[in-house]
Amino acid sequence: MTGAAGARQLFLAATGQNRGKTTTSLGLFAAFRAQGLNAGFMKPVGQRWITIDNTPADEDAALMRGVFDLTDAVALLSPVQIPRGFTRKVIEGQVVEDLGAKIIAAQVELAEKHELLLLEGTGHAGVGAVIGLSNADVAALLGAPVIIVSEGGIGRPIDEIVLNAALFAARGVEVAGAIVNKVELDLQPELPRLLERGLARHGIPLLGVLPYRQILSNPTLAIIEDGLQGETLWPGRDMDAIIGRVSVAAMQPEHVMQRIGDSALVVVPGDREDVIEVLTNLWLDGKEHPNRPLGFVLSGGYRPSARVLELIRTANIFAVLMEGDTYSVAAKVHDLLVKTHPEDLRKIEEIKQLVSGSLDVDRILAAARPVPTR
């Protein structure tokens, strides 16, 4: 069944950045398709965007397009992007384009092709309010019910979900329920029950929880290499190795040794050969060390000496050379830690299995509502 007459929709929002909204979108979309549904996707408003076929597209829309081989036009998947300086132009009256009309036009065209639309928001409910396109505004514009995604704990996710639900309700948007991500079920198996009871006091159904998985919070070395686009000095022994943590090593070697943990990716100036040598030797002395580094991101554009480079190769440790100071390089690494990329096949498969095995997909589908007739 396709066409606007039968199309239904869901809007997936979050309580903030990096709460797991895109992870949930990806997993749910896969689950919808697994049920044989002709599902379509749209990210109505995007803040972080790239160019695909000379057309700007939000990064999350690009991810979904790449993972699921979506054939809809890029402009439908990502109708509105917010580039740098755009907010100022809107406030100063320099933007006259009807952005809401672009979003509705994309919805109408997608609804003609698909029987179910998954709409993904940007950040918390109020993001975009400055230009009149907050998540609450957009959900109201599209007439879509909202599912709110938050992350682990008890008090904080409930507080955040209730706060965001209030803004959606103020715009007349139905809050269909909530999903809580990164829940430590092994440590606190009672959390789902407490979350369900806590949210029920505010009239918000808990639609499920997603257990914490390290691979979903930590990328592989291959993703770091691809995302940083630096000069790879040595690939190391396993590009699919999962990074346990990121350590910035700008102190004396003995202090570094106290701070790095297992499977650490170490961001260190390339001219701190004392630090690099001490950490590299943890792989060369024939002993088992719990804090052996998984790899190096060398900042400052400083290439280590031939002697130290040979140590890295002998130890078979990943190393990439980056321009920029240590802070800016570490910030780039952090951005990569919290994003999913089309090339990360292992992580994507884990997401699909986690969502299908943890959430009641039929119950979530029951929350979908018809796309309004325009």
Language-model regions: role of each:
Residues L110-K113, V256-A264, K287-R292:
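Flexible, charged surface loops at secondary-structure boundaries
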Residues T122-I204, L265, G270-E343:
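Conserved catalytic-core segment of NTP-binding enzymes
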Residues L185-E225, Q229:
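Canonical P-loop GTPase G-domain recognition
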Residues R213-D274, L337-R374:
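Non-catalytic interface/targeting segments
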